Amino acid sequence: MGNEGKEDTLPSKFGRYTLVEKLATGGMAEVFKAKILSAHGFEKQLVIKRILPHLAADRNFVSMFIDEAKLTAQLIHPKIVQVTDFGEVAGQYFIALEYVEGFDALALLRTSAQRQVRIPLPITIFVMMEVLDALDYAHNAIDGGGKT
């Protein structure tokens, strides 16, 4: 298997993707900036969300992850990243997502708190309105079977 998916040796191959940088690790999954290379020099950046290894054997969790991939793939909205692929590599399930360049909101909040500087209210309101627009869409989305 080589260095298949080992984050301590980035960049590393993960199936047809190359994991370039670890972006985050949560309680259930880890997220990587990645790229896919194809014919004639085609290259695309994306994000790989991969189940943590210790959860990969939990059938209930894997089932929830699969449901997440299926549901999220149905959400087509300009403020929601698109699912581009779903699969399994060497027993590790993953979701491939559109990569969106931007700033780290958590880092902004932490820096603001450390410096005791408030984020200007118009910026806060704008960000919240954008998030609420996406949440409203996701909450009211209807699947192919007519269910919300």
Where are these regions (language model features)?
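Conserved ATP-binding/catalytic core of the eukaryotic-like protein kinase fold
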Residues: 1-148
